[in-house]
């Protein structure tokens, strides 16, 4: 969505309308990435989809955080009281990936929570065509669901910040 150099200048959305617009853009991004994930999952090479999902999901989380003004760098630029509000709100909504550097280990931990889906996808690859379609479908819905959950968590954190009165980062 944005290049890394733009990260520090993206602000937390300033109103409920802005949050809704960012939410919808991010949900569209989630759907596009979920379709990519499903396409890779349909390829009958065991393990390829897992590696692809790790990378796609890490990029997705970074992009969503940036769109909401909630990346690690963006939160660091907030005034201390707003930083605290952002992290408390993230903990409150279960947004463990808000304001964090998304690493492979973090993504693996999250994907392990949906481990049964991964096992079903891999087992489905043993059955030609029908298994590939099932694997792609499971991959799409799992990826989309996890992405949507993160979008909603970011939207709630952004709403908390707007309610608290944040509209621009503090400059050093």
Residue ranges and their predicted role:
Residues 1-40, 54-172:
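Terminal, membrane-proximal amphipathic helices
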Residues 51:
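Ordered, soluble secondary-structure elements with a strong preference for glycine-centered loop motifs
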